[in-house]
């Protein structure tokens, strides 16, 4: 912790910042480029004519920690780099040290009015506590941490939501001088002490350290919300204001366009499909801007689960913060990574149940606060909704929830709190040591491993080389049986079909993630589907409405005429050039080769049938959109839209997710028909598959959603049924007397297959 403090003090200044309200803040004079509503001078880099970038979210810069690392969407067959991997900035270090004699506090005088960050004149004044005067209190109870985290004592009142608050002069606890800042920076020996009664009238963050013999003790950080009404979880971020928001130096800012080593893609020629023009300093993606830096800053995070009704913060932690994304960095609201897995921040692991979809998961080394990527201008939940449809399948995805973010007390609107996709993701969700596997970023035939500490692409490179060069034709192919020890074929099949259903044009030569190796068969992760569900403007050469996804991935079944434009090349060049085409590089090639095998082809089709029957349905999309949007009350949407106006001519703002639901109306039938044509499938027949007793049945390796399951399959595609006993039970056979395990059956209408367990 001392190491962090020394570094931070070397860059931090102290001041008391003033601001007025949602439409005019302390950011006005410091960072007039970052953006607010049109009536404000706050962060005014974004003009009224703002457009979305053509590609996808979460691209990375250089790697240092355990994150997928890439500073560019390299060699991806799209018109411009996709927003598709996760940033892994390097942490800054300094050997600067502190030396200053202890100073005596100044004498107190009359109360001081502090107007730090934000007034809530436009917000309802429903608050959780009445006017309060506090002299000294302990830190609020911090829970859910690993053993090496020790809650800090605080001479400040507890952070939280107040109607008003008065702070009395602070009493040193160790015989030194308590010095404080109000701009998110760490206190230095030049920071002012609080020596007189102070009335907190607006949102304020205070950081204080007691200096003893010139050395700063632990810093305490408290965020106070005055007359705030927030009905969503709140994430309060405290970060050095200058380093984050200064118009010249701040990470969030465009700056003077001197960011080195990246180049300004905004000056590229060619078919870039630029759609976003919110920044008057440079065109999208403006790679020379500060927000493309891989720098990481220290940040303090406070979390209030129930918004302004939270009596005290649920947890707080020191971490690092960095800007993430690829083209979505150009958006006025940025995505950031919060990373705790660094010795400099003192805390290794946050133990808290962040996601209701998996409450038992309580170990996080990092998370993202996402601006909804390339869908920033269109909706709140598109990517999160699509990928969450994979819950219960063999495909992993990043869990998420919507939260409201404040920087140094300043309202920054709704963000998607999202699992971070790196090796720690596997440790969090599976309990597998993160260093024993590899998370691979797959861009065509280019592979990149997440993190350091032995991270390697070797296993996946060998897998790809093997699959792309092997003849898998025929039944009972030994080579196919061998590859199943290296590739989770159910995960791969379900993943590929789900992305086809999503109609994601920025895939499969981009936005592909898989983890495994070292004895773990590679499993795939649904990731960054921003360009799915009819997103426009989309990828050049990709028809957002009519593109046949089997042609896009595998190449046209017959020679076809494309629609021109290089785009993502579709299935090789054929998707966009009208030539006879082959499979797209990378996963498309793998799928094409594996489909040569009779067993895998049967598995792919039957897994797809189960997905279309239970997971990728109109009803499922409708209910998922409704449940997700229910977590974002209309009052919160209105406030976010006022803070970040969605006024781009190239996009249609869909705050309720209605367009997502409408797109799903006929999507299942459309992709099913494409599959029928690709594989010459015949009539659909309804089959019931049941388990009697303590056990379950797998259909071509895929678990069923219920023990008595009815699904439509194709009459000319066999089913492989495998009975799996559970909890000491024994499989005794099928109800028709058959005892095969597994069992191959030809489906006919009205059939029932019941496995008996005793």
Residue ranges and their predicted role:
Residues 135-136, 140-305, 312-317, 677-758:
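Short, compositionally stereotyped local motifs that mark structural "simplifiers"
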Residues 13, 191-210, 618-635:
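Short secondary-structure subsegments characteristic of cysteine-rich extracellular domains
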Residues 280-449:
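Conserved ATP-binding subdomain of kinase catalytic cores across diverse folds
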Residues 1-17:
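Sec-dependent bacterial lipoprotein signal peptides
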């Amino acid at each position: 912790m001392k190491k962090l403090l020394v570094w931070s003090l070397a860059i931090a200044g102290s001041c008391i910042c003033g601001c007025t309200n949602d439409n005019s803040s302390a950011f006005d004079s410091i960072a007039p480029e970052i953006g607010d509503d049109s009536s404000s001078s706050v962060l005014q880099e974004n003009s009224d004519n703002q457009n979305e970038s053509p590609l996808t979210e979460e691209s990375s810069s250089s790697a240092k920690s355990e994150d997928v690392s890439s500073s560019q969407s390299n060699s991806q067959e799209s018109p411009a780099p996709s927003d598709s991997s996760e940033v892994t900035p390097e942490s800054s270090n300094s050997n600067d040290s502190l030396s200053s004699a202890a100073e005596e506090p100044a004498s107190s005088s009359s109360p001081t009015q502090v107007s730090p960050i934000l007034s809530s004149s436009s917000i309802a004044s429903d608050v959780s506590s009445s006017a309060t005067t506090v002299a000294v209190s302990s830190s609020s109870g911090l829970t859910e941490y690993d053993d090496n985290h020790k809650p800090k004592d605080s001479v400040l009142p507890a952070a939280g939501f107040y109607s008003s608050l008065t702070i009395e002069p602070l009493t040193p606890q160790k015989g030194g001088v308590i010095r404080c800042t109000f701009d998110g920076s760490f206190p230095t020996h030049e920071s002012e002490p609080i020596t007189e009664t102070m009335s907190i009238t607006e949102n304020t963050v205070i950081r204080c350290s007691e200096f003893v013999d010139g050395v700063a003790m632990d810093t305490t950080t408290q965020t106070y919300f005055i007359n705030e009404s927030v009905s969503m979880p709140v994430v309060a971020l405290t970060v050095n204001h200058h380093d984050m928001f200064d118009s010249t130096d701040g990470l969030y800012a465009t700056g003077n366009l001197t960011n080195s080593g990246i180049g300004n893609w905004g000056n590229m020629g060619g078919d870039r499909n630029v759609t976003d023009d919110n920044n008057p300093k440079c065109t999208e993606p403006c790679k020379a801007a500060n927000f493309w830096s891989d720098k990481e800053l220290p940040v303090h995070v406070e979390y209030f689960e129930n918004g302004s009704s939270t009596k005290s913060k649920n947890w707080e932690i020191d971490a690092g913060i960095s800007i993430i994304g690829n083209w979505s960095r150009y958006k006025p609201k940025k995505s950031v990574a919060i990373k705790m897995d660094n010795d400099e921040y003192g805390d290794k692991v946050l133990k808290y149940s962040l996601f209701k979809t998996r409450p038992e998961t309580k170990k996080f080394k990092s998370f993202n606060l996402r601006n909804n990527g390339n869908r920033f201008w269109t909706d709140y939940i598109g990517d999160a909704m699509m990928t969450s449809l994979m819950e219960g399948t063999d495909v992993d995805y990043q869990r998420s929830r919507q939260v409201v973010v404040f920087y140094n007390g300043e309202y920054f609107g709704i963000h998607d709190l999202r699992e971070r996709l790196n090796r720690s993701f596997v440790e969090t969700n599976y309990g597998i040591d993160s260093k024993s596997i590899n998370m691979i970023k797959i861009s065509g035939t280019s592979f990149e491993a997440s993190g350091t500490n032995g991270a390697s692409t070797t296993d996946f490179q060998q897998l790809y080389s093997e699959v792309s060069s092997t003849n898998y034709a025929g039944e009972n192919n030994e080579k196919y049986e061998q590859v199943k020890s290296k590739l989770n074929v159910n995960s791969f099949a379900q993943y590929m079909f789900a992305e086809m259903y999503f109609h994601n044009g920025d895939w499969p030569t981009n936005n592909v993630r898989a983890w495994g190796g070292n004895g773990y068969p590679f499993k795939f992760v649904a990731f960054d589907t921003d360009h799915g569900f009819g997103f426009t403007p989309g990828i050049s050469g990709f028809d957002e409405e009519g593109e046949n996804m089997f042609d896009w991935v595998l190449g046209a079944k017959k020679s076809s005429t494309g629609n021109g434009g290089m785009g993502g090349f579709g299935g090789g060049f054929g998707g966009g050039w009208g030539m006879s085409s082959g499979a797209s590089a990378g996963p498309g090639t793998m799928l094409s080769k594996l489909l040569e095998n009779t067993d895998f082809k049967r598995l792919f089709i039957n897994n797809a049938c189960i997905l279309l029957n239970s997971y990728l349905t109109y009803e499922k999309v409708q209910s998922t959109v409704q449940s997700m949007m229910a977590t974002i009350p209309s009052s919160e949407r209105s406030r976010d839209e006022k803070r970040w106006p969605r006024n781009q001519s190239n996009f249609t703002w869909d705050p309720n997710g209605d367009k997502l639901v409408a797109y799903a109306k006929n999507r299942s039938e459309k992709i099913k028909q494409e599959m029928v044509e690709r594989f010459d499938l015949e009539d659909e027949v309804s089959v019931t598959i049941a388990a009697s007793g303590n056990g379950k049945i797998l259909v071509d390796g895929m678990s069923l959603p219920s023990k008595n399951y009815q699904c439509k399959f194709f009459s000319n595609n066999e089913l492989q049924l495998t009975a799996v006993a559970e909890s000491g039970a024994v499989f005794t056979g099928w109800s028709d007397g058959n005892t095969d395990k597994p069992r191959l059956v030809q489906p006919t209408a009205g059939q029932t297959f019941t496995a008996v367990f005793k």
